[in-house]
Amino acid sequence: MELIPAIDLMNGKCVRLFKGDFNKRKDFTKEPHEQAKYWESEGAKYIHIVDLDAAKTGSPTNDKSIKDIAKTVNIPIQIGGGIRSQERIEQLFSYGIEKVIMGTSAIENKELVKDLSNKFPGRIIVGIDAKDGKVSTRGWLEQSNILATDLVREFSSFKIASFIVTDINTDGTLEGTNEEFIKRILEITDIPVIASGGVGSISDLLSLVKLENSGLFGVIVGKALYENKFKISEAINVLSSERLTDFDLNNNYYA
């Protein structure tokens, strides 16, 4: 299971939101490309970027930061936020982005996702952000009655790289993941799944490791890293430990 650090961009800065609320935003001082380079130096194998401005408005305003990150690191980057056309995808690929995440556009135009996943096999990720099991769109500002599980079933026949499933109720809380929600997703698809939302400790990561054999490829972590709850290097060492099966999940050492 891969630990994937997140960089959320607003106005060219690294930020974190609480439960997706744009009014509950915390800014961090490090420049985005510097932050990405630090994650890489800590052992990260991937970088996850969300352009929050583009997710909210549909208009990309953080391309300079995105290009700076792509030039700075030598690991694959996946990016989401306001990606709604083939032209935008090709532009991001030209910057050096490895994979793109389609969220709102995937839900509103499934045929577009099907077409793009055929044109760019293995490079399109479908992002499903859910609150109480129902999908939210447009930067989590709009709530639908569509079940996340129904979307996963539908998209599982496409040539997509993976699903990213975010539980909005836990995102930014540092209070642990919605493990039951993740399990439900894994049960209905053979496509790799990346979980997001709620990780606050290494114990939270260890709780998810047992789902790796069910198709959990990775977990996205943001706030816990920014607030130094643990380091990527520490987490990688624990997750790769040969003693993992003997680790007591009730041990509070990493909590």
From Swiss-Prot:
NCBIfam families: 1-(5-phosphoribosyl)-5-[(5-phosphoribosylamino)methylideneamino]imidazole-4-carboxamide isomerase
Principal localisation: cytoplasm
Protein name: 1-(5-phosphoribosyl)-5-[(5-phosphoribosylamino)methylideneamino] imidazole-4-carboxamide isomerase
Gene Ontology molecular function terms on file: 1-(5-phosphoribosyl)-5-[(5-phosphoribosylamino)methylideneamino]imidazole-4-carboxamide isomerase activity
Pathway field: Amino-acid biosynthesis; L-histidine biosynthesis; L-histidine from 5-phospho-alpha-D-ribose 1-diphosphate: step 4/9
Native organism taxonomy: Bacteria, Bacillati, Cyanobacteriota, Cyanophyceae, Synechococcales
Catalytic activity: 1-(5-phospho-beta-D-ribosyl)-5-[(5-phospho-beta-D-ribosylamino)methylideneamino]imidazole-4-carboxamide = 5-[(5-phospho-1-deoxy-D-ribulos-1-ylimino)methylamino]-1-(5-phospho-beta-D-ribosyl)imidazole-4-carboxamide
Active site: 8, 129
Keyword tags: Amino-acid biosynthesis, Cytoplasm, Histidine biosynthesis, Isomerase
Entries under HAMAP family matching the protein: HisA
Example of a GO biological process term: L-histidine biosynthetic process
GO cellular component, one term: cytoplasm
Cystine connections: none
Pfam families for the chain: His_biosynth (PF00977)
Compartment(s) of residence: Cytoplasm
The family this protein is said to belong to: Belongs to the HisA/HisF family.
CDD domains in alphabetical order: HisA
EC number: 5.3.1.16
Tree of life domain: Bacteria
